[in-house]
Amino acid sequence: MIVISHVLGNVKTDPVWAEKLKAYELDYLTLEHGDMYKNSCRKMTEQGKDLGISLERNSLLADGDVLLCDDKHAYAIIVKLILRDVMIIDLTDLLNFSHEMMLKISFELGHALGNQHWKSIIHESQVFVPLSVSHKVMESVIQTHRFTGIHYRFEKGDSILSCLTPSEARLLFGGAEDLGAHVHVDHSHSHDFMGHSHEHEGHRHVHNHAGNSHDNEHDEHHSRR
């Protein structure tokens, strides 16, 4: 096992490293959003090198980080970060509204996001919400509320990483496998837990347990209290 205790540099942000490693054989350590905040972990590179990551507390690995550089053999190990997409909700137009309207819309937006149990952070005049369900479902939730003066778009997670503090990045991406993603829109909701999903509006259930699935149609109606 090769122990990695610090980052040497970054090929994405440092042109010196980018130029140096052009002629090197590059091996990649692929990390997903749940791994990037871990100070200590054991991972295999794409070429099968066994790495023991042991970084200082609050260190955060970034896409393009150089973990190992062997000049003798012209070989280097680079971090390849795969982050979930992020919905960016732009609140800039609210600054032109009255204080009362600004507070009202902000409160309603916070309630809508909280009702979905979606994590979010506010950065300047934007709210960042990591993708926990499909783009279509997240769009549906925002569109259902018909917020005035609010615009949204989706961006790749790594495109906003540089403007986040380590604690903010950890909140949005770290260890956040949303095993129980709830979506509540009007009188329908869906759950996705370990392959178990429900849809209520009609009324249909689809279950998938350990490779076994069954589809049940229900005629009965549910009332919500």
UniProtKB/Swiss-Prot annotation:
One Pfam family, please name it.
UreE_N
What GO CC terms are in its UniProt record? cytoplasm
Keyword list, A-Z:
Chaperone, Cytoplasm, Nickel, Nickel insertion
Gene3D superfamilies, per the entry: Urease metallochaperone UreE, N-terminal domain
Q: Which GO terms describe its molecular function?
A: nickel cation binding; unfolded protein binding
* Compartmental location: Cytoplasm
Instruction: Quote the biased-composition stretches of kind Basic and acidic residues, using this chain's numbering.
Output: 189-202, 212-225
A GO biological process held by the record: protein folding
Look up the signal peptide feature and give its range.
none
Record carries keyword Zinc: no
Q: Residue ranges of region Disordered?
A: 189-225
Q: What is its main location?
A: cytoplasm
Function as written in the Swiss-Prot or TrEMBL entry: Involved in urease metallocenter assembly. Binds nickel. Probably functions as a nickel donor during metallocenter assembly.
Q: Which family does it belong to?
A: Belongs to the UreE family.
Full protein name: Urease accessory protein UreE
Source species, please?
Edwardsiella ictaluri
Provide the gene name from the record.
ureE
